[in-house]
From Swiss-Prot:
Residues the record marks as carrying a glycan: 64
Organism for this UniProt entry: Crocus sativus (Saffron)
Tissue specificity as recorded in UniProt: Expressed in pollen.
Family: Belongs to the Ole e I family.
Pfam families linked to this entry: Pollen_Ole_e_1
A cellular component annotation (GO) from this entry: extracellular space
Keywords, ordered alphabetically: Allergen, Disulfide bond, Glycoprotein, Secreted, Signal
Subcellular compartments: Secreted
Organism classification: Eukaryota, Viridiplantae, Streptophyta, Embryophyta, Tracheophyta
Main location: secreted
Name assigned to this protein: Pollen allergen Cro s 1
């Protein structure tokens, strides 16, 4: 009889813990963080002459993988160190979520590359069912490009051993 009670007690405890996990999963809160920079050499990555951008606008958009419908959208503006933070409530396991550049505060550095190979957005995973323990999601840095590269760019590219790459 004692063995049977222990089994029932164990099963009951597991059920309670399972329900607590389900209740907690419904309360997913994430924070998406990232930064925006000015790509002063027009090469799609940061260099020592890149500058951070205060006042740049980005948007986070999630779309359902199968239906393609928008399930979440939010915008944020970068602070004085070029960083943004977007609070997100909910779990978007069945979605593709991306950060995109929207608006630059600098008319000299406001182009977004539309080349096929260029990084036009930063994907983030907004689900607690992916093995990430933290609720903070870090997006890759995104950059607006200057209309013309800085005169220092050929030297910068040479320092990086990128002799065949030309700042365009």
């Amino acid at each position: 009889m004692g063995k049977c009670q222990a089994v029932f007690l164990l099963v009951g405890a597991l059920c309670v813990l399972s329900l607590a996990g389900v209740a907690n999963a419904a309360e997913n809160h994430f924070k998406v963080q990232g930064m925006v920079y000015c790509d002063t050499c027009r090469i799609q990555f940061m260099t020592r002459v890149s500058t951070i951008m205060e006042g740049a606008t980005v948007k986070l958009e999630c779309r359902n993988i199968t239906a393609g419908t928008q399930t979440f959208k939010a915008e944020a503006v970068t602070d004085k160190v070029g960083q943004y933070s977007i609070p997100v409530h909910g779990d978007f396991q069945d979605d593709i979520c991306e950060i995109e550049l929207v608006k630059s505060p600098n008319s000299e550095c406001s182009e977004v590359s539309h080349d096929v190979y260029a990084k036009q957005s930063a994907k983030v995973s907004l689900t607690s069912n992916n093995g990430e323990a933290s609720d903070i999601r870090s997006a890759n840095a995104l950059g607006f490009m200057r209309k013309e590269p800085l005169k220092e760019c050929p030297e910068v590219l040479k320092e990086l051993d990128l002799y065949d790459v030309k700042a365009n």
